[in-house]
Amino acid sequence: MRARDPDAEGYVERDGVRVHWQQYGQGEPTVVLLPTWSILHSRHWKMQIPYLARHFRVLTFDGRGNGRSDRPEGAVSYTEREFAADTLAVMDATATERAVLVALSCGTLWSTLVAADHPERVAGLACIAPAVSLAPPHPERVVHSFQEPLGTEEGWAKYNRHYWLRDYRGFLEYFFARCLTEPHSTKQLEDCVGWALEVTPETLIATEEGLLLCGLERFRHLCARVRCPVLVVHGDQDAIRPHAQGAALAEAIGGRLVTLAGSGHLPHARDPVKVNLLLREFVESLRAMAR
């Protein structure tokens, strides 16, 4: 049971990989709710879709590796440029000439690529809890190797390919508990773990190894090429990506920063009313500018 069923849906195939998309609502502008890390599919936007579709045309699609999209093998299939190209393919398949892109976490990487390389296609960019290496990470996240076997399974040592293959659910429960630091997050935690179990640990390892756009100067240069209006929303209690990374992105890209007091890494799930109103206000401001 969903609060809002899609008005249209389909697949677009690019280089042998099929990507599933859904469309909701009508009117201009179009808002594309982008895939995040393929640990989650597009259902993580379920609290945004019904509200935004009452005001705009909304597109979502499952990122490669999850949902109803294909799961190609190998890290080369999960680079930022592959996700960016999928975004453009979905826009083309749905006759979407221009759109406002909304990204969560590492979705910021491919949304920024699209905005920088194809400015004529992007009217605006909203980044929620951006996972960008423009400021230092939380210290506890850089203690352990992802690739090497570890002698501990405590804390962030679970963010390790060998642990994922051994106790995938254990990793998911830990990771999403850190994403959802707000009290009373049981439903959101259950949703996220359930969705993530639709992905195999082998696929998730490939997605992690495919993220190449993490070099500081390289991403700074990309940000400097973005010309559209940008909104950055970041919680000050984000245990995955520190608030300083969102602040640094807003500065580097010339965007507006909104800080959500007490929010963790998934504010669109835990405080959807506030996030939805921010997104609507941002999109409507772009529509007014276009008149």
Describe these PLM feature segments:
Residues V17-P72, V76:
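Conserved HGGG/HGGXW glycine-rich cap/lid loop of the alpha/beta-hydrolase fold
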Residues V226, V232-H234, D238:
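Short beta-strand/loop motif that positions the catalytic acidic residue
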Residues K158-E217, H221-L222:
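Conserved alpha/beta-hydrolase catalytic His-Asp/Glu region
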Residues K46, T60-C106, L277:
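Active-site loop/oxyanion-hole signature of alpha/beta-hydrolase fold enzymes
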Residues G254-R291:
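Catalytic active-site module of serine/aspartate enzymes centered on a nucleophile-bearing elbow/loop
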Residues A239-Q245:
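Conserved alpha/beta-hydrolase "acid-adjacent" motif
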Residues T112, A116, A123-H162:
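Flexible "cap/lid" loop of the alpha/beta hydrolase fold
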Residues M1-P35, R54-F56, T96-E97, R280, ...:
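Alpha/beta-hydrolase fold catalytic core
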